[in-house]
Amino acid sequence: MVSVRKRKMARSSVRKNTRRLKDRQAKINIHSNPIIAANWDKSLTLQQNYKRLGLRAKLGTMVGGQEKPVIKASQKQEEQHVPVSEIENTTDPSKIPEGEARLIRDPETNEVTQVIYGTMKKKSTEDTPEVSTVVKQLEETAQKNAKIKKERKPSEQESQWLQKLYEKYGDDYEKMKWDKKLNVYQQSAGDLRRRITQWKKLNLIV
């Protein structure tokens, strides 16, 4: 027999909390650029892919959500270590690593007579990344496309409209702009000149 509570729950308009699916990640359109599409790794996130390709997901400064590079302790020590032979005879603070010091003792009494504190900054463990082959390919493609200047071609309807204006006014663009019937959108004289010059060029009109 079903309990009173179960019957009330069955009649209730409030839906029970069912299992919810995790929100799917937004699909990234990588096919718009064939170079990026060819080098994209679907198993990585957007930021991981961009970093691997030598690109940046955001132009501004990243706030949180950044993965720190994994650096082994031995590698870190090697990069920051300065051999003793390089600093044992120097009195220049800029050649002694910051956080370290050189003690100069009296040869007779062995007492410390001078302490030279180091001012040399430690090298960053993150080297400046080299320009990747993907970035080079993208730059080459951008340069090629920049050289190719595509001219805008007027549509058939626009060509007919320009032809009517030219047949009526010739090269008098000041009169053209005041024609309320033909120049419905009130194009300026300079704009009409540019359009008709291009139209004449396409139609081989001198």
Swiss-Prot record:
Keywords attached to this Swiss-Prot or TrEMBL record, sorted alphabetically, are: Nucleus, Ribonucleoprotein, Ribosome biogenesis, rRNA processing
- Region feature (Disordered): 1-20, 69-97
Nucleus among keywords: yes
Where in the cell does this protein reside?
Nucleus, Nucleolus
Q: Which domain of life is it from?
A: Eukaryota
**A biological process term (GO) from this entry:** rRNA processing
| Family annotation (InterPro entries) | Ribosome_biogenesis_Nop16 (IPR019002)
Similarity-based family: Belongs to the NOP16 family.
Q: Which PANTHER family match?
A: HSPC111 PROTEIN-RELATED, NUCLEOLAR PROTEIN 16
Q: What name does the UniProt record give this protein?
A: Nucleolar protein 16
Mind giving the lineage of the organism this protein is from? Eukaryota, Fungi, Dikarya, Ascomycota, Saccharomycotina
